[in-house]
């Protein structure tokens, strides 16, 4: 306080008067300073980074429950050789799935009272361990109200002292005798899960392919501390929820392609009956062979009749999508995407695609809804169909709830504890300089580009209908999905038409932007970090997802001398044949940075019944010789500022500039 004088705080008096309402006396302000100083010297909480979950809700939920192997590690540390491996496995499974595991135990256990006594004591030990790096206040806020007092007593009493040992045993025995053991065990297990992960970062792509994006969003909406950096698939769904019909068509097409209807129908109550009726009528005699869904990634078993219907719906929505996208491209010549309007290059009579002077035979030649003289015009039936589907998307309450969550906790990028998080790319030129991208009348690049696109995505959803700004933003959200200079995409094109209709694979090629090659260079990564206000150093990193790391071919997730980490390891089953693994979690705790590599998750049922955990391999990316404390984090910087303000308030009290309120 030595350098704070009454003169130096005169200009801060209005703010200090407001602060004095929360801390009305010298004693209150002093106590808060002591509390904050104590917090600064605790170990930093554990951050978990996940990316490209793609609707794989069971694997996602399991990784949250087992904290990427941290719970198992702690159980091993605590019980070591005092328990058999099978017993430690039982404790872990109970912590992950308390309700389901309790059900099984009750069917098998002969002496339930004894089991309760042993298990509750074991859970108390685990809970004491995971809560030890937090203040009592923080732990208290995480406690379920009905058991708050009892859990606090159990956590903060040592069972080594004989008197206290008896006290703890009485509490546990009473929990059992009052038939509250089940509820108490569930509460303890959930608390252990919650305290093991302090904060969760989702670096994009919750949606697409897998069956349960809506279940993942439900989990996140109730999660205690998380943030999201939007991925291209998330943005596509946000565009659909904002009312962009091209985005809506894309979302439905992807669902049909992977035969995953659960998110649309069960999750969001989207009525697909109009599409089914239209597809059955329009393509009644059409085998639609090339539109058969990829069944090895489907969310359910379908009979032949249903599969036939999904195939017809897939074709119907794909044709509609190509027309809707052409409308945006014509309306927005500034997007520079004329090369994605391709239907007028089709000779429908001869069934060939004429591209750059060369003819390519089409894989499908039946287009009853396309008028060769005006190929981009929606038929009256197609327009009516899109009107009905649009209305269904706009009226889904569950979708509105999830979108609010994505907007509240999400953004295009995040800087957190010297780490820069974004899903895909920051567009670059070949020389490594930032690419200037024109949006409207201005050019944006680097950080400004990501901020501008973030703002446009929000405008598309929240702005009043009818304004020019809203209409442009709505169109731009679609550009963010497939536009060449979109930071969430950054390829020369999305070859949707060619991949469906042309067999020649030379036309399927999508060339990635310069970023994806240049991000291997440390100098380029340093320049990007500086652009986003992160000082390059040994503990500064860029964290990306988006491009699956082909571990099976020897590709490494750690790039540019450790400055950049790509943590898309294939949560999505569709990518696991490419990656050879089933996802990464990056874990950043007080001892350093670890990359956890997961093998495929069998199923929730096997985890509960057989105690099957995800097999994970931990790679140490960085080891801190000294433990990282809260004072070394962004939160620590905030607390230091609060302490300085409270110090000023103390000076104001002690010099009479502000009077204490008794």
Task: Please identify what each model-predicted range represents.
Residues 1-662:
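Feature recognizes metal-dependent phosphohydrolase scaffolds
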